[in-house]
Structures are given as structure tokens and as C-alpha cells.
Swiss-Prot record:
The gene is pgk. The keyword Glycoprotein does not apply. Substrate binds at D21, F22, N23, R36, H59, L60, G61, K62, R119, R156. It catalyses: (2R)-3-phosphoglycerate + ATP = (2R)-3-phospho-glyceroyl phosphate + ADP. This is Phosphoglycerate kinase. It comes from the Bacteria. Keywords: ATP-binding, Cytoplasm, Glycolysis, Kinase, Nucleotide-binding, Transferase. Disulfide bonds: none annotated. The keyword Repeat does not apply.
């Protein structure tokens, strides 16, 4: 079902509630990465161009007690957003009550207001996280229409997304629209061949994604720590490599079901220690020494995966190929990132998290069609699950 987008709404003279994802990393009260704020600008600027009043809100971190509030205020975000927009952003240091209501009433067309961290409502009974109906209704009463642009929390049913949408006409912002188009497109209607590359440490984190993508993709390439559970399932020696022993039978079943659709590494970069200072070397995937552990894919696997990618029309990548944070074991992730970035005739998508960070670190971000802003949300979307934050947006 097609969802309404912000361009479907009449915004002139309207109080537009906008759920943004301003959950940015902070250190000593300063924002260390403003990507999420920048990502929300197109939606905010469109609302202002249409002479709407933009009332923004977001969560920031987890807040369970009064002490947790320390360093979790959105005030620094308001200051940064003001710089990026080149206009004042009124900050209201509360989540409800007369001060907020008065500030909204006094807001003029084309003005912006940001109110305090929605998770401050979690201190007394988790009202935000448990989607308290009264809170959703109250927030909805502050506006005329609702725009949800926070894909990063779309897999959660909270008062600030589902709660408001249950009470008010709602639409997707431009960022949410893009996520639905690209991440949803992989699941619903990909251009073929579709190749999925999945990495990361644990099979358990990606089981649902692997199972779903095996029914959708033409090839699923597996790297990262979870490969060793698959190798063990094939009876290969994996030495001291990461193993989820309770998932070996499951991996066996997936291998049987997948046939040659699932492609595993043919070599591994191994070391005796989980350290950047220890000696390391490359061995065949079926002969990892008993006293060593695999920490990356080797060059032969990079070449194999690069070959499997040729001719792909859609590529989705989620999860690093090795211990990316240690430079000796980052080559696999870099190699795969380069191989995808060099594809000229494919829609290329990164499903958030560490892979997105890797692409940005390597300066390849602009070579990808889409880099998702939501780690958990994009994983659940790729699993084929319905996301409450998306489902609750009004249908066209």
C-alpha cells in the first residue's frame, strides 16, 4: 500500500509535527557527528518553504532515571540545526505542559521549534517507549498534521511515532520515503540479479535476514565472524574462531536449503590473538590452524565476491567482513566496499550500522545509491517484518 509523503499534505499555515531522528553521538555536550541532523534538512526546509510551522522532536540515547538526563538534552542539537538552516530554532526544554503549548501557539509560519528529548517521558513509566495512548494523543493535539521522518526508530512502536500517527493525518518525510523506496524495494521488487552481502559477528543477529533474503536474492555472500558457524556446520576446522555452537544445526539447515545460492569465504586471515600487533597470515578456509582464529576474509574471497557481484542489478550490503576496527583485519571490508562502489549499472544499498561507517570512513559514501540511516530498522525490513513506524503512516 502506498503511503502518503510530505508533498501530499497541505502545509500552509499548519502546525506540522515532525518526528526526526536526532539521536546523534555526543561527547562532553558536543555533537561528534551531525549526519542525522543533515539528513533531516530536506524535509524541514520543504515544510518552511510551504509556510508551515515546523515542530520537531526526537529521542537521544536511553533515559530511565533522572540521572540519565545528564548529557541527553537536545539543546546542542537545536544550536547545530540553527547553524545548518541559517535561522533561529526555538528550543523548549520540556516535553509537555504550558511552556511548550505557549511556544507552539506563538510560532509563526516558516519558523522552527525543537522540544526536549522524547525519552524524558520514560522516567515515569516508560510512556514514550511503551506507546502510552494518552501521551500520543497529547502530542498529536499540539499539531495539525504529522510527518514521520525517523526511519531509525521505525521498527519500534513508540508514542512519538505510532502514538501520534494513530490520532492525526500523517505522512512520510523525504528521508523515510527514500528508505521505504530502497530498503523496501530490495524486499518487494528488486531489479535482478539481486546480490546480498551479509557480514558481522553473529549468525543469531542475521538469521531472519539470511532466511528472508535466501527467498529473494539470487546470491547471498556471507563474511564476518558468522561465517565460522557456517564453516563448522560444513565440518570444517575453524580453530579458535568465533563460533555460536547452538546455531550450528540452524546453519546446516540454511546451507541445505540454499544450495549454491549461499557463498562462503574460501580463505581467512588468521592470528593467534585478537590484536593488531600479533602476527597474521592467510590460510585456506578449510585449514584454519587449531591455535588460531579467523579475523577477516582473505584476498581470494575478495576476488570471489567481486566476481559474484559482476552483472548484479541490485546489491544490498550489511555488516563488515572482518574486525574492521583493527587495520590488519580491515582489508576484506575495504575490498568488498570498493567492489560494490565500482559497480556502474546497479542500485547499491548499505543497510546502516558498521557498513555505513566503513563506506564513509573510506570516502565511498557518494558511490552508493543509498546508505540507510537505520541499523535495526533496516535489518527488520530486510527480514520482511512490518515496521510499526511505517505501517502507521496514512495510506494515499
Amino acid at each position: 500500500m502506498a503511503k502518503k509523503v510530505v508533498t501530499d499534505l497541505d502545509l500552509k499555515d499548519k502546525k506540522v509535527l515532525v518526528r526526526v531522528d536526532f539521536n546523534v553521538p555526543m561527547k562532553d555536550g558536543k555533537i561528534t557527528n551531525d549526519n542525522r541532523i543533515v539528513a533531516a534538512l530536506p524535509t524541514i526546509e520543504y515544510i518552511l518553504e510551504q509556510n508551515g510551522k515546523a515542530i520537531l522532536f526526537s529521542h537521544l540515547g536511553k533515559v530511565k532515571t533522572e540521572e540519565d538526563k545528564e548529557g541527553k538534552s537536545l539543546r546542542p542539537v537545536a544550536a547545530r540545526l540553527s547553524e545548518l538552516l541559517g535561522k533561529e530554532v526555538k528550543f523548549v526544554p520540556t516535553t509537555r505542559g504550558p511552556e511548550l503549548e505557549k511556544a507552539i501557539d506563538e510560532l509563526k509560519d516558516g519558523e522552527v521549534l525543537l522540544f526536549e528529548n522524547t525519552r524524558f517521558e520514560d522516567i515515569d513509566g516508560k510512556k514514550e517507549s511503551k506507546n502510552d495512548p494518552e501521551l500520543g494523543k497529547y502530542w498529536a493535539s499540539l499539531g495539525d498534521v504529522f510527518v514521520n521522518d525517523a526511519f531509525g526508530t521505525a521498527h519500534r512502536a513508540h508514542a512519538s511515532n505510532v502514538g501520534i500517527a494513530s490520532n492525526l493525518e500523517s505522512a512520510a518525510g523525504f528521508l523515510m520515503e527514500k528508505e521505504i523506496k530502497f530498503i523496501g524495494g530490495v524486499v518487494d521488487n528488486p531489479a535482478r540479479p539481486l546480490v546480498a552481502i551479509l557480514g558481522g559477528a553473529k549468525v543469531s543477529d542475521k538469521i531472519g535476514v539470511i532466511e528472508n533474503l535466501l527467498t529473494k536474492a539470487d546470491k547471498v555472500l556471507v563474511g564476518g565472524g558468522m561465517t565460522f558457524t557456517f564453516m563448522a556446520a560444513k565440518g570444517q576446522e575453524i580453530g579458535k574462531s568465533l563460533l555460536e555452537a547452538d546455531k550450528v544445526e540452524l546453519a546446516k539447515g540454511l546451507l541445505e536449503k540454499a544450495g549454491d545460492k549461499l557463498v562462503l569465504p574460501v580463505d581467512a586471515v588468521v592470528s593467534k590473538e585478537f590484536s593488531n600487533d600479533a602476527p597474521f597470515h592467510t590460510v585456506s578456509a578449510d585449514s584454519i590452524p587449531a591455535d588460531e582464529m579467523g579475523l577477516d576474509i582473505g584476498q581470494a574471497t575478495i576476488d570471489l565476491f567481486t566476481k559474484e557481484l559482476q552483472g548484479a542489478k541490485t546489491v544490498v550490503w550489511n555488516g563488515p567482513m572482518g574486525v574492521f576496527e583493527l587495520s590488519n583485519f580491515a582489508k576484506g571490508t575495504i575490498g568488498v566496499c570498493e567492489a560494490i562502489a565500482n559497480l556502474t549499472d546497479a542500485t547499491t544499498i548499505i543497510g546502516g550500522g558498521d557498513s555505513a561507517a566503513a563506506a564513509m570512513d573510506l570516502g565511498f559514501a557518494d558511490k552508493f545509491t543509498h546508505i540507510s540511516t537505520g541499523g535495526g530498522a533496516s535489518l527488520e525490513y530486510l527480514e520482511g517484518k512490518e515496521l510499526p513506524g511505517v505501517a502507521s503512516i496514512s495510506d494515499k
